Amino acid sequence: MKRRLVLPLAWAVMALALAAPAAAAPTREVVVLTSFPKELFEAYKQAFEEKYPGIKMVVKQQQTNQAVTYLRETRAKPEADIMWASAVDAFQTLKGDGVLDKIALSKETLARMPARIGSFPLHDPDGHYWGFAVSGYGLMWNTRYLALHKLPAPKEWTDLTDPRYHGHLSISAPSRSGTTHLTVEVILQAYGWERGWALLMQMGGNMGAIAERSFGVPEAVISGQLGIGVVIDFFGLSAIASGQPIDFAYPTLTAVVPASVAVIKNGPNGENARAFVQYLLSDEGQLKLFSPEIGRLPVVPALYARAPKGYPNPFTMKLGGVEFDDKLSSSRRNVVNALFDHIITFRHAELRTAWGAIYAAEARTGKVRAQGKNLDDGSRDLAEARRLATTVPLDGMRAADKAFNDAFKDKPEVKSRLETEWDTTAKTNYGKAIDRADQSARLR
């Protein structure tokens, strides 16, 4: 009796199993860590998943400096497969930390791409990261805003020190944006340490706002909250392609460097990560850079024949002017970012007020000179006010010293002491600059 009951039950179970839908095969993944805006990575996510339907692209969006820290902290058991960002010096840092895997590309892929853009390598010569797009750094502006406020269009970094731009500019903090860090480094390497910081400090004094993320700058300019933004080129190019009232210019002294992609060593999905890199460098992946929502520059010169009309070609244009040293930029990255924060970002209100006082005093000086009056004492006060508002509290030689940078990175007590010194010096200097500017006015 029991035997007769068991057999029908077994057949019933088998029938149910056959009738049930087959369990879906586990979806493979590639985990991508990126600082790029949603418009860019969503477009690539959709295209990549269509090309590789068995692989799900999981995106973790992080600011570049945070991503570098995250990859260092998880290197024993990586959770990400891909690092994908604009800041080439961040890749240099990660390579030095042993975080990146070495990958080889096919001969066909390599043959389509030059080794350099100008004098700068497009790829790591050892194969730890690969340029997938070219980026330049410059200025975007809202044409309607400038017309409304009767402001000229800027062309050079030095134009941003014009008193007429006071309160009309925007930049993001380099500690929160890898692309802004590169822009700051471009200026420091173009003009030298002291002169470069003097330029940055006066630019900072003209800023209407310092954004927390790089995306905040184009948003403010496109919306008309502010007139001019210091940006990576694709923010300007994509806005123009989308029909916004925006224009963009590369300053004479800028750098054209690659935005890169790398595979994380011992990441959970190494094979899928390599497929993602190959897709980015394929014709399909490269042509997607021309999309209006992306607006970036491919690394395959032949594809510019298929670019939208008027699209910049960095391989034929004379761009650059700065022999960018990514190793120098990488070595002092932490120091430069912290210094910018403590003398510009965190003291922006005082810095902006100081430059407002200086500009007002200089305007009064011009009127007094026109009357033929003696200005010696007032001129000395104004010169001192400018000196106080443009003096960086760190020597350039020290900033480039390896031991100094290592101590700043590895010893919290050293970092804390220096940051306190910089902050105190900035606050004191800007207060004195305001006093000297006001004093010069009282002598009229």
Segments and roles (model prediction):
Residues 25-92:
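Early extracytoplasmic/lumenal segment of secretory-pathway proteins
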Residues 140-145, 257-270, 288-289:
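A bilobed periplasmic-binding-protein/Venus flytrap-type ligand-binding module shared by bacterial periplasmic
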Residues 168-172, 199-204, 210, 241-267, 279-301, 305:
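Periplasmic-binding protein-like
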Residues 89-93, 222, 226-245:
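A ligand-binding cleft/hinge motif common to bilobed small-molecule-binding domains
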Residues 78-85, 210, 227-232, 247-249:
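Paired acidic/hydrophobic, glycine-rich loop segments that form the ligand-binding mouth/hinge
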Residues 35-42, 79-222:
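Extracytoplasmic ligand-binding site segments that recognize negatively charged/polar headgroups
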